[in-house]
């Protein structure tokens, strides 16, 4: 069986760092499969996350999404430094990869879910901002914390990557994470300052420094 995943030929600006259950379905009859071949991304090294999943699946077809998620969580330890022991770097790569899964394209590709734990909170924030309703301090704190985690994850992986080849192939995405996280944190701080009716000079210093 040939699977066109995690191929990015039609979307070279993306990384596809997930999608286990979308392409490797739980509970498939193993008698109907003689082998599985994947079509990798443009970047060979980060494609190993999908290759690890394919190896797990081919060895023992998972029976649930929870089992697949467990394999996905474990994959980064082996992809980063080929060990059952998690490191700060492998955990950081996994954290970033939660948000680098969907190609965000048209109907030519299968839609994948990313930022699952964050998207509802972001949507709630955006709706409140659009509607002009008060955003709680807890919401601001929660989202600033999330983007701080991502900012730190990028820095950690850049400094401690177990496999430098992966880091080198995803360096542009790490650069993007640095800029995106900084922009998001400063934007959230600025919105909070405006909502709190801070003076303009304080808003500038709050959001930029």
Indicate where each model-derived feature is located:
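Substrate-binding groove of N-acetylhexosamine-processing glycoside hydrolases
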Residues: 1-209
């Amino acid at each position: 069986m040939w699977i066109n995943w995690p191929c990015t030929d039609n979307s070279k600006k993306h990384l596809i760092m997930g999608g286990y259950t979308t392409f490797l379905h739980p509970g498939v009859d193993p008698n109907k499969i003689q082998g599985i071949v994947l079509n990798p991304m443009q970047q060979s090294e980060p494609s190993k996350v999908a290759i690890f999943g394919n190896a797990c699946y081919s060895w023992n077809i998972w029976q649930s999404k929870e089992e697949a998620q467990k394999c996905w969580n474990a994959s980064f330890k082996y992809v980063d430094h080929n060990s059952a022991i998690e490191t700060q770097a492998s955990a950081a790569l996994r954290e970033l990869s939660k948000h680098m899964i969907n190609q965000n394209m048209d109907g030519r590709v299968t839609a994948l879910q990313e930022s699952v734990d964050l998207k509802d909170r972001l949507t709630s924030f955006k709706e409140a901002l659009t509607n002009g309703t008060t955003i709680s301090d807890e919401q601001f704190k929660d989202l600033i914390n999330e983007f701080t985690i991502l900012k730190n994850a990028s820095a950690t992986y850049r400094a401690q990557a177990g496999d430098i080849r992966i880091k080198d192939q995803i360096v542009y995405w790490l650069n993007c994470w640095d800029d995106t996280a900084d922009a998001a944190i400063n934007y959230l701080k600025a919105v909070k300052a405006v909502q709190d009716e801070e003076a303009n000079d304080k808003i500038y210093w709050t959001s930029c420094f």
